Every structure is written in C-alpha cells, then in structure tokens.
Regions:
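Flavin-dependent oxidoreductase catalytic cores
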Residues: 1-306
Length: 306
C-alpha cells in the first residue's frame, strides 16, 4: 500500500495534502439553529482522524437568503468562534479544513430564509415548494460581493480551502440552466450570458482567495432532464471555470427541483418523502405526492456515472 498513489502527498493550489483522499461536501444537517454543533465538530474531526487529507463542511450560504434547510450554516459573526474551534480540531488531526460556499436561490421557502425566495427568474419551485422572484441586477452584484466576503470570513476561521457550489440547481446552477434562466438581459439567453453570474462569482472568489487558499468548484456534468444542461454545455462551463485558475473541479449531476436523484442513481422515494413532510405547512403537497407523485416525478434507473 505504501506505493499506492492515493496515499502520496498532493499539492492542491497553495496547500499540500498528506494524501489524495478528500471528503467532499455532502450535507450533514448538523448546524442546528444555523450554527455549528458538537455533532458537526465530532463528525469532521473523526473524518480527519481516520486519515483523510481534507474534510469539507457543507453547506454554508454566503447570505441569510441563501439558506435552503434549517440545519445549514450561513455567514454571520455569531458562528465565527465555533468554526475556529472546528478548524482547530481538524488541523489537530493532521488534515486540512475546507468549507462549501453557495447560495440556494429558489431552493428554499420563507420560513427558512426569512424573505421572499429569489432565483435567476420568477417562477414556482415544486420541491420547496414556493413562489420565487427574479433577482434584480443590484441584488446580483450584492451576492457576488457576498461570495468574496465569505472567502475572507472563512480564512479568518482557519479554513484552508473553499468549495464553490455551482451545481444541483442551486443559484449559480439556476443561472446556468436554460430550464430556470429565462432572463432577457445580459444574464440570460445564450450560454455565454448564462455563465456571466458564475464568472463574476469566480472572479470575486479568486481575488479574495489570494495566494494562500485553495479553491474547488462543484459543477454539473449534466442536469439530468430534457430541458436542462447537456454534457456538451457542461464541458464548456467547466472550461470557463478553469480559466479563473481554480485548483480542482468536483464533478456531479442532477437538479434538486427537477431531477434530484440523478446524482444518486435511483428513483425518488415518493411515499417516504410525503410521509416526512410537515403535515401543517405542506398538507396539500403531501396529498398530491401520495396520489399523483408517480405521474409528476420520473423514475431514474440506476446507472454508473463514471
């Protein structure tokens, strides 16, 4: 095993990893009250103790409006000390600490984000479920700046790397996909225009990351449904991301509000999903899923992605 490439040191941008095993971002649901918990600390320090070179905290929104679930983090001063404790714990086990930054766009509802959900365009998200409005240009600029601020914040908390979430139908993905982006300004229409928000975010992130933080981007290989992004477009998007000088790509697939189980390679458990829905807030959607869910949501047969 000594000569196995997996267990050799690797340079990821400005940081050196003790091996090539990285725990990529996957939602833990351990940020109770939108704050880091002891469970979150124990989980990631255990990953580091197990020998991983880097472990990634997921998911942290760059603003309050970008929180998708109650168990998620968002950038604000009250979590700084707890995040410092978390990164100290990871570093004590010999691993690097990474955090996933993003904005969920329309993948939320008022009770969670405390505001009218926003997206690339106005519409209705069945998954949340919620109505959402299109972002104004000045709001787009504010979110771009929030990504830069988030990178600075995470550096102060001791993180070595940030992973930018540009897939799965979250906000950057909503701008990229023709399914959710029906804008008629410079942020919509052609793929070049649909990549504009992503490019602005990446430029801001790379400027603030400087020479001491690694930057990784999670991006789709395809959206997983007919009117979404295809492989050819996703290749162009990946090439565009690379132009910014990012240090690695995390390849994924799927669109939570349309093809959520594409990335997992299986069909959505409609009955189970309906069972666990809040009966008071979503009673109408719960009934709809039980009776006609199989007509609304396609079955996704298992297949290997790689």
């Amino acid at each position: 095993m000594k000569n196995n490439l997996l267990f050799t040191e690797h340079k990821l941008g400005p940081i050196t990893l003790r091996n090539r095993a990285i725990r990529s971002a996957a939602f833990e649901n351990m940020a109770y009250g939108n704050k880091p918990s002891q469970d979150l600390y124990d989980y990631h320090t255990a990953v580091a103790r197990g020998g991983a070179a880097m472990t990634t905290v997921a998911y942290c929104s760059v603003t309050r409006s970008g929180v998708s679930f109650d168990g998620q983090l968002y950038i604000h001063d009250e979590i700084k000390e707890d995040l410092k404790k978390l990164t100290d714990g990871i570093h004590a086990e010999g691993a690097k600490a990474s955090i996933q930054l993003g904005h969920c766009g329309n993948m939320t509802h008022f009770y969670t984000c405390k505001c009218m959900p926003v997206g690339a365009s106005t519409g209705f998200n069945l998954y949340s479920p919620t109505l959402h409005r299109a972002l104004k240009k000045e709001e787009i600029k504010d979110i771009v700046k929030a990504f830069g601020h988030a990178v600075d914040f995470c550096r102060e908390c001791g993180f070595d790397c940030v992973e930018i979430h540009a897939g799965h139908g979250y906000l950057i993905s909503q701008f990229l996909s023709p399914y959710t982006n029906r804008r008629r300004d410079e942020y919509g229409g052609s793929l070049e225009n649909r990549m504009r928000f992503m490019n602005e975010v990446m430029a801001e992130v790379m400027e603030h990351a400087g020479n001491d933080m690694a930057v990784v981007v999670k991006t789709n290989m395809y959206d997983g449904f007919k009117s979404g992004l295809k492989v050819e477009e996703c290749i162009r998007i990946a090439q565009e991301i690379e132009k910014h000088g990012v240090h690695a790509l995390v390849l994924t697939a799927g669109f939570v509000s349309k093809a959520p189980f594409t990335v997992m390679g299986g069909a959505m458990p409609i009955k189970t999903l309906a069972h666990y829905m809040n009966p008071w807030s979503f009673w109408w959607l719960r009934l709809a899923l039980r009776f006609v869910g199989h007509l609304m949501i396609p079955t996704v047969p298992f297949k290997e992605l790689f």
